[in-house]
Amino acid sequence: MALYEHMFLARQDIAPQQVDELLNIYKGVIETYGGKVGRVENWGLRPLAYRIRKNRKAYYVLVNIDAPATAIAEVERQMRINEDILRYMTIRVEKHEKEKSAMFSRLDRNGHIGHDEKHPRSPSRQREDVIEGVE
């Protein structure tokens, strides 16, 4: 079996629970075809670089998969049909990364570190800019 990184973008107007349901459906398809799902990173609702089907934001989900090509073909076929999925991309990789992805672990615009279910974001703090010589 081959190793893949699969990412999909779900519409902004569905609930986060529906994103988890979509993920579980696709996990089931992969397991039906004899594959395994590794690490899952749910990046949450993020802005898009440009509008896709009148959406300015989307739920980003990254999944590490160890499965045969037939499983990937079936998942992509079902994603093409599902209107809640805006975009998807599957890339074959040599090995899965042990650490979190670079996008997930980088600082966001507000200076917060990316978060997951085990380590939620801390509440935002007021930023106080101090200018030397000005009181």
UniProtKB/Swiss-Prot annotation:
BP terms from Gene Ontology: translation
Matches recorded under Pfam families: Ribosomal_S6
Entry keyword rRNA-binding: yes
Entry's Gene Ontology molecular function annotations: small ribosomal subunit rRNA binding; structural constituent of ribosome
SUPFAM superfamilies tied to this protein: Ribosomal protein S6
Any single Gene Ontology cellular-component annotation: cytosolic small ribosomal subunit
Keywords annotated in UniProt: Ribonucleoprotein, Ribosomal protein, RNA-binding, rRNA-binding
Region of interest (Disordered), ranges: 104-135
InterPro entries the record matches: Ribosomal_bS6 (IPR000529), Ribosomal_bS6_sf (IPR035980), Ribosomal_S6_plastid/chlpt (IPR020814), Transl_elong_EF1B/ribsomal_bS6 (IPR014717)
Protein family: Belongs to the bacterial ribosomal protein bS6 family.
Record's function text: Binds together with bS18 to 16S ribosomal RNA.
UniProt protein name: Small ribosomal subunit protein bS6
